Amino acid sequence: MIMIKIGQGIDVHAFHNNGQQQQYVVLAGVPIEHTHSLLAHSDGDVVLHALADALLGALALGDIGQHFPDTDAANAGLDSRVLLRYVYGKVLAAGYMLGNADITVMCERPKLAVHNLAMRANIASDLQTDVSNISVKATTTEKLGFTGRQEGIMANAVVLLVPNTSGV
């Protein structure tokens, strides 16, 4: 019997005016110009944080806060792609690999459609898979809630892990 694993992760960060003239948010490792940055201990990449939590959850390995606590100064400003590659190393070490990932970003702004392929390509590269196995979608909450008021951004990720038969 083939044992597949499914994981789900969610991450939220508040928008923050950092006082800089040019501000941006980082989503799936892609810097995107915006009116605000994100308030976070690391780079605040909600896409990669949700994805990393989904990968860890599929294997019951806790969450990114346990592996990268915000109380550790070494994690300040951490590039979330480094975090994701570390987590994926744990997936490979457990004998699994990514089947596919489906990620939804919830925000009114910034608009993400023009960044979709770059986000998917970064994730595919970090997870050693084809871009066709990575879905990134964006939606609004029709001006409802904290995302609708443009106070923050949220991402939800679902992953399917399959036994690693590739020898990687």
Swiss-Prot record:
Residues annotated to bind a divalent metal cation: 11, 13, 49
Cofactor note: Binds 1 divalent metal cation per subunit.
Site (described: Transition state stabilizer): 41, 140
Catalytic activity: 4-CDP-2-C-methyl-D-erythritol 2-phosphate = 2-C-methyl-D-erythritol 2,4-cyclic diphosphate + CMP
Positions with a binding annotation for 4-CDP-2-C-methyl-D-erythritol 2-phosphate: 11-13, 41-42, 63-65, 68-72, 139-142, 146, 149
The protein's required cofactors: a divalent metal cation
InterPro entries: MECDP_synthase (IPR003526), MECDP_synthase_CS (IPR020555), MECDP_synthase_sf (IPR036571)
GO process annotations (BP): isopentenyl diphosphate biosynthetic process, methylerythritol 4-phosphate pathway; terpenoid biosynthetic process
Subunit (UniProt): Homotrimer.
Role: Involved in the biosynthesis of isopentenyl diphosphate (IPP) and dimethylallyl diphosphate (DMAPP), two major building blocks of isoprenoid compounds. Catalyzes the conversion of 4-diphosphocytidyl-2-C-methyl-D-erythritol 2-phosphate (CDP-ME2P) to 2-C-methyl-D-erythritol 2,4-cyclodiphosphate (ME-CPP) with a corresponding release of cytidine 5-monophosphate (CMP).
Record protein name field: 2-C-methyl-D-erythritol 2,4-cyclodiphosphate synthase
Source organism of this protein record: Psychrobacter arcticus (strain DSM 17307 / VKM B-2377 / 273-4)
